[in-house]
């Protein structure tokens, strides 16, 4: 599905912004999460390649730790990346929200669609990336890939002390819930307006667009687009890569 020969009505150009300034405390001490090795290659490189695998993506902006821009530039230079895609590294901010804004500020004129992708989701398949782009091209101002939930979810009253029992206050209807992934796709003007307008701390960019009152739609996500947050996730990611190598020489 990565054939970009299909013209969009506006000839829209697409860029991806990858905020990679987080420290990844839950993975333990050491390098920032995005720079942790996965099958011998930093997760960030896997994530960059995942975005560049889409022929629709002409530019990838990596938002590095404020004190790690040179290191990330060297990292990109040291790994094989598609020549048809441009790559830029800019310093990030104190929060993910600020880092995404700095990535947006680095985009040149002529970019109409922006993907925002977590560096900690290194294995998202190209078909998922293309599906998000296609939905934005079709007119949705904001698009998120997501999966139905397998587990029942309980809404609770958070305990005052971590580890204490938490009272359940509601059980949302599972059929109406989705677990959201990335890349999230946006009409550029809509996302810029969201970052200029919304000052609340949010967990993803689609939430900012929701606060504008703009439409956000969901497209099917993929099981391999999971977030590598804990040590067990690294084990699963290694297994996915091993299966890919076995199946198609990835």
Swiss-Prot record:
Pfam family, one: IspD
Catalysed conversion reaction: 2-C-methyl-D-erythritol 4-phosphate + CTP + H(+) = 4-CDP-2-C-methyl-D-erythritol + diphosphate
Site positions (Positions MEP for the nucleophilic attack): 174, 227
Function recorded in the entry: Catalyzes the formation of 4-diphosphocytidyl-2-C-methyl-D-erythritol from CTP and 2-C-methyl-D-erythritol 4-phosphate (MEP).
PANTHER family for this protein: 2-C-METHYL-D-ERYTHRITOL 4-PHOSPHATE CYTIDYLYLTRANSFERASE, CHLOROPLASTIC
Stated family: Belongs to the IspD/TarI cytidylyltransferase family. IspD subfamily.
UniProt-recorded name of the protein: 2-C-methyl-D-erythritol 4-phosphate cytidylyltransferase
Source lineage: Bacteria, Bacillati, Actinomycetota, Actinomycetes, Kitasatosporales
Gene: ispD
